[in-house]
Regions:
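Sequence signature of WD/YWTD-type beta-propeller architectures
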Residues: 1-159
Length: 159
């Protein structure tokens, strides 16, 4: 009950670390409520620093683990978000070089199957390889972000 904070139905364990042998973090339910996408790593938080971190997904109606192999690589996959219609997943990955986190996007069909991820397009494609900074937690947005360049620049002024 969202008004009282009381649990009204039976509570089930969706992820058991003793059985799975790792930790789950950043659980996010799809907009249609069908799926739970999360990051699994060997231990604790900050999975972005764990090369074995992968994205996993559970179908909530029957608690079946879905195939997420299309999303994962031999290196880190971590922070993620759903598009508002649930047809896309945006996530961070170190699959290109194992050092820098970059954003990938993959389609999701109505049955929870993922398409092949691709590097998030940039106006200048070289930005994906020349940018020597990591992306942190990616989020989809639905509209233009209007920023005053002077105000944003002043946030990074060092006195």
């Amino acid at each position: 009950d969202e008004n009282t904070g009381q649990l009204l139905e039976q509570v089930d364990t969706l992820y058991n670390p003793a059985v799975a042998g790792g930790s789950a973090s950043f659980p996010r339910i799809s907009p249609d409520g069908k799926y739970l996408l999360y990051t699994e790593a060997a231990c604790a938080t900050f999975p972005i620093w764990h090369a074995e971190a992968d994205l996993k997904m559970i179908r909530l109606v029957d608690k079946v683990e879905m195939d997420t192999s299309a999303l994962n690589s031999d290196d880190t996959e971590s922070y993620h978000s759903w598009s508002s219609d649930g047809r896309w997943v945006l996530f961070s990955s170190r699959r290109l070089d194992g050092r820098y986190t970059r954003l990938f996007i993959a389609a999701v069909d109505e049955n929870g199957r993922f398409g092949k991820p691709f590097l998030l397009p940039q106006e200048d494609p070289e930005q994906n390889t020349l940018r020597m900074k990591s992306y942190n937690i990616p989020e989809f947005i639905r509209g233009e972000v209007k920023l005053d360049k002077g105000k944003v620049t002043s946030l990074f002024d060092i006195e």
